[in-house]
Every structure is written in structure tokens, then in C-alpha cells.
């Protein structure tokens, strides 16, 4: 299964509560934090919620 590398590139200050919750659920706390997650629908949904705050890359 593919994996996604998610990097937080913008601050969560001034964002809505659900966006902050999605960042925390992804394991992102501050700018330039990086996590690698499995490519699953629930992860894609969280990424879609915060797509303006993160950068996503596929990794092997």
C-alpha cells in the first residue's frame, strides 16, 4: 500500500477547530513537522481538511 509524507508548511493559528483537530490527529504540531502515513480514505479526508496548511508527497 502507498504511503504519504505529510509536511506542515503553515501555522494553525487562526484556523478553525476541526482543522486544528485534523492536524493533531495527523501528528503535526508545528511548522516543518513531517509524518508518514498509510494512504487510507480517513487519512485522505484529514489531509483534504487541511490541504492549505500541508504539503503531501507519495513515498514508496
From Swiss-Prot:
Domain of life: Bacteria
InterPro entries per record: Ribo_uL30_ferredoxin-like_sf, Ribosomal_uL30_bac-type, Ribosomal_uL30_ferredoxin-like
Gene Ontology BP, a term: translation
PANTHER family per the UniProt record, alphabetical: LARGE RIBOSOMAL SUBUNIT PROTEIN UL30M, MITOCHONDRIAL RIBOSOMAL PROTEIN L30
Keywords: Ribonucleoprotein, Ribosomal protein
The protein's name in its UniProt record: Large ribosomal subunit protein uL30
Stored HAMAP family: Ribosomal_uL30_B
CC annotations in GO: cytosolic large ribosomal subunit
GO MF annotation: an example: structural constituent of ribosome
Keyword Ribonucleoprotein carried by entry: yes
Name of the gene encoding the protein in the UniProt record: rpmD
Source organism (scientific name): Salinispora arenicola (strain CNS-205)
Binding partners and assembly: Part of the 50S ribosomal subunit.
Entry's family note: Belongs to the universal ribosomal protein uL30 family.
